Amino acid sequence: RIDRCTTCHVFIDKVGYEDQPNPYKTHPKVDTLAVGVDSAHPVKEFGCTSCHGGMGERVNDFNAPAHTPQNQEQAKLWEEKYGWHEPHRIPSPMVPVQYTEGQCIKCHKEEERLPMAEKLNEGRQLIEDYGCYACHKIEGWEHLSKPGPALTKVTSKVNSLEWIKNWIWAPHAFNPKSRMPHYFEQHNNSDEESKAKNMAEVNSMAEYIARTSKTYKPIEKYTGGNVANGKKLIENIGCIGCHQVEGVDERFAKVNEKAGPHLINLGTKVNPDWLVSWLKRPDHYDPTTIMPSFRLTDKEANDIAAFLLASKNKDFGELTFPALNKEIRDEILVNDYLSAFETIDAARAKLEKMTDDERTLELGRRSINKYGCYSCHDIPGFEGDLPPIGPELTKEGSKPIEQFGFGQQKQVPHTRHDWISQHLKTPRIWDVGVPKIFRDLYKMPNFYLSDKEVESMVLVILGLVDSKIPLAGQKRLDANEKMYQEGMKVANKFNCYGCHKIDGIGGSLSDAYEDNRDYGPPYLTDQGHRVQTAWFYDFLKNVHPIRTYLDVRMPTFNFSHEEINKLVMGFQAGSKQLTFEEDVKIVWEPGEKEAAKQIWEELACTSCHALGFTKEDPLAPDLRFAKGRLRSSWMDAWIANPHSFLPYTSMAAFWDDGEGGLFPAVEVLDNDPKRQIKAVRKLIQEFGLPTQPKPFPKNN
């Protein structure tokens, strides 16, 4: 491939022209991300069109490279200024600049998250949050679990069949921030005839779900609780790391995590006994859930339940869904299903042999299959490896524009990004003005996405292309990197990123503690170097307290043995640690131990690390367990310069980044910082306890 873009963009790889207009401007992040000679993607190796698309070999005028404007306003400006016109017969015109980041996917197919690609990471997260991968096959996303809750025991969870019907019909009427989309009353089915048929479908689906639901007996009883304390617990123990919760304080309300549902109006939705049981033992109701246990006491669980149950949607709870119209039910069964391979008369004869209940359940089953409910939810009767309901998106960014159905929507510009954007905003609009029978209508539901969400998701979809990148140009993972990515897939599945910033990515909940990050979930920076592998494995199996002074809790997850191994080995590989442990043999040099004690006293280590040493409240982790938990080499690096690992830590850098003298000055060990640090570390390891703290009971 030949790129001649620098014929016009003459200073694109040179620092100092950041404030110039195009085409004389310096490329963003020129020294770190792209173009610059010292960047990750030097222009002489990667060119321009590998990221931006277009025809880089054609530079005879402004239109030749297939420039694509960001929006209609820029298109008009270009028309006036450069005589721009829409590229014709060019399979891959330039990607609008707001979507460029999505092109990283072409070369970085195996990586879960990319540093310096915030918008791409956000788009990927949105596609996961809204469960697009469940209805549309996307190569590389097959490991993700179903995004919706299991409906196998749903009648033990929700208050009534009427609630199920009204929820299926209009989920946002109950929960405005729900990720459950709207299938009904859209552009192509809001006429009275379609609504009547859709109501018959909803009645039948709800009946099918209710009739096939297994009985579940809650293991706890709701006894009432303290609403104020429940609110405090939700804010402080870590629920906000996965859930948006109505009614919490502002600093927690701004945490925009969507791994779990938005918790609002539960008093109208759920059985109180079920809720307390779920809070105590999520895996008892759903053995495959990613919802962890916070090891709540009975009082804590009841207090949290009291707060959640206090939120109600009275109007929704009093709604009565229109009764099933059996005539319409039978009409749909005959015309849309039973006559598919039979004559109408034969279909009617088949219907006559079915009881009233059988007809309702048959339409329910058929409708669940029609709308693909099984893609997001486990539903009895839909077990097994069923095909996704929607078309595959693996190469959607390369799909010829002629294959996008614009229908009668002449106002939508004929580009990939404009069609995909419009489709995400109003997916049924393509049927408007097009004569279709009921069963052939578009079925893609409406998620009511914001413009910002749409832009981020389009960015990702445009990066899903059928490109032939040479192996030398692809990011090919070595054994360590592959192991790290496998671990991060597990971290993503259980939303570890919601609480923790992992190697610079994620950490929404920790941002709520910006005034004092020491009291939030810790950053997991160089975690595989920090902790010993055996300790980490045991900790994830049996969580025990490390920072006993914190309100926020590390929960107990329902990890499989394989998932724990992938996490532990992933972090170890990410930190390039080749051994499980570092052999700790404490051998003192003459006078070294006395010097270590002198430094320990001078620095007043126990003023923060109080546990086991003083009766003061601790402000830092219990050092008695450092020997079995931390690696020696990491401890040396941490003591020398803690802020290089955690910029927010209150731990002081006593050794001036490990290079200068000790402050306050203690003239021991020849004033050698490395010897002093090593001596302190050995002292900590020597008084370390041989065993870990007693783990919490697994499910209490």
Please provide the spans of the model-predicted regions.
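Electrostatic cytochrome c docking/interface patches
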Residues: R1, K29-H41, H88-P96, H108-I127, ...
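Mature N-terminal segment immediately following signal peptide/propeptide cleavage
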Residues: C5-V10, R365
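Electron-transfer interface patches adjacent to heme c in soluble/periplasmic c-type cytochromes
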Residues: V37, H41, S50, G54-M55, ...
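Short metal-binding segments enriched for Cys and/or His
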Residues: P42-E45, G54-F62
